[in-house]
Amino acid sequence: MVSAMRSGVEIAPDRVVVRFAGALDRRAVVHVRRILRAYLVRPGRVIVDVSEMGLEWPPGLDVFPAVLTAAGGWPVACLVLSGPTTRMREELDARGVPPMVPVVAEGESAERRLLMRPTRVYRQAHLPADLAAPRAAREFLRQTCAAWAHETCLPAAEVVVTELVTNVVEHAGTACRLGLALDRSGCEVSVRDFRPGPAPRPRPRPAEARRGRGLHLVASLADEWDTVRHTDGKTVWVRLAGCAGEGADREE
C-alpha cells in the first residue's frame, strides 16, 4: 500500500528544506527515509519541517537519527527538525532524538541551528572479519576525532578500539560495527560482533603474560564499561568520561 505521506522540497545551494505532511505510520517511514537519504548525501544539510506531520506510530521517529547515522553523521551530514507539535516534541524527547537531531520550534532559526554541532554526535563504521580491522578502526577513530575537532580522547580511545576490535577478530571471528559517540559526559566506544556467546570479561593473567591482557587494559582506562547481549551477538561499550565534548553546540 502506498504511503499517504506527502513531501515538498525547497533546494538552496547550502541546504535543503523538506516539508512532510500526513501521518507518520509504518508505511510513511519508508517514504521519509528515502527522501532524507537522497538529500543528506548532497548537499548534506537538511531542515525537516514537520509542522504538518501527524504521529500515528511513535517508533517511526527513530528514522531521523537512523538516517543521519547512515549518511555519515555530523559534520558529514547535518539534520534539524522544525515545528513539531507538542505531542511530537514530547515523543521525540522520550525517544532521545534531540541530542543527535536538534529540534527547533516553528519560527526559530533552523538555519542557524543547522550550523551548530549537536549535543551528541555519533558515527559508525562496519569492519570486516580480518586482521586489518584493528588498523582500520584506529584510522576511523582518528578521522572522526579530527572531524569533531576533539582529539582529547585519542590516546585512551585508540587503545580501547584496538583491543575491542582485536577481541572480535580473534574470538568471535565475525565482522563488527564500531560506534563512536561524544557528548558532554564523555566519549563512548562501542563494538558489536555477530556471534552469540558469553560476555567477555578480564581473566587473571600472569604479570609477564604478553597476550590476553586486552580487557584488563580496557577496564583500567574505562570510567564505565559493560556488555549488551543480542540474539545474534553482543556489544561491548566503554565510556571515557575524562574527554567530554566541551565544545558541543558550537558553530562550525
For each feature predicted by the language model, list its residue ranges.
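Surface-exposed beta-loop interaction hotspot
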Residues: R113-E139
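A glycine-rich helix N-cap at a beta->alpha junction
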Residues: V101-R112
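Conserved short strand/loop->alpha-helix "switch" segment adjacent to the catalytic nucleotide/phosphoryl-transfer site
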Residues: A28, R135, E139-T162
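STAS-typified acidic loop motif
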Residues: V2-R37, E52, A125-P134
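Conserved beta-strand-loop-beta-strand hairpin that lines the nucleotide-binding pocket
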Residues: E90, A94-R95, M100-P102, P118-V121, ...
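Amphipathic alpha-helical interaction surfaces in cytosolic regulatory modules
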Residues: V29-V101, E188
